[in-house]
C-alpha cells in the first residue's frame, strides 16, 4: 500500500485564474489532505500571500497543510548566493507568520534547491522539502539525474547523497523524464502512477493552482483510493519516516 502526498504550488496571484476552490472540493469529496505551498519571490514577496489570506486560507480545511515555496530569481536571473537565498527563505517564513502560519514544508520553484539552503531551511523549522525531481535535468539550472526516488535525508554537502541532514527530501514521482503533475495529460500521469504503484512506497504528486488539474485530481484520487493508497501531508510523512 503506497503513501501519497499531493503538494500544490500556489502562485496564481499574477496568473489570472486560481483553481484552489475546485481542488479543495475534490479533496473534501475523497477526504484526502493536500499541502499548499504559497510562493514568495524576491520581485514579488506579497501577492500570493495576500491572495490566499483574502480568498482561500479560510476555505482550506484545517487537516490540510500550508507551507512555503520560494522562487529564487530576481528580474529573471537565478539567485545563487547562499546568504541572499537564506534571507529570502527567512522573509518567506516571516510573511507567512503574519497570517499565523508556521510552515514546516517547502519547495524551491523550478526545482532550484541548492545545498546551502539546507541549514537555512532547518533553522526556520522546515522539516520536509518536495523539490527533488529524480532523473530530470533542467539545463543550465539543476541536474537531478541520479537523485534518489524515495524520501531521504541528504548530506550537507551533496543534495543527491544520503546523509545526516535533519531535513527530509521527498522526491516528486517521475517516470521517463516526466514529473507527476495534476495538470499533465491523464495518460501520462496514469503511467507515472502505475510505475510507482509497482515500485515505490511513497508517491509524491505535484500541482499548480493556476493550471486546471481538477478533473485529473478527481481521477487521481479515485484511482489511488481504489488501489488502497493512503494520503498524508508532507509534514505528516516526515513525522512518520524513519532514518
Where in the sequence are the language-model features?
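Active-site beta->alpha N-cap acidic-glycine motif
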Residues: 1-59, 223, 230
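Structural preference for beta-strand elements that scaffold enzyme active sites
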Residues: 3-7, 33-35, 65-67, 103-105, ...
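Short, well-ordered alpha-helical microsegments
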Residues: 16, 114-118, 213-217
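Short, surface-exposed basic-aromatic patches at helix termini and helix-loop junctions that form
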Residues: 25, 57-59, 115-127, 222-226
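Metal-dependent polysaccharide deacetylase catalytic core of the NodB/CE4 family, i.e.
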Residues: 33-116, 132, 136-138, 174-176, ...
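C-terminal domain-boundary segment and adjacent tail
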Residues: 35, 44, 189-243
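Active-site-adjacent pocket scaffolds in enzyme catalytic domains
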Residues: 108-199
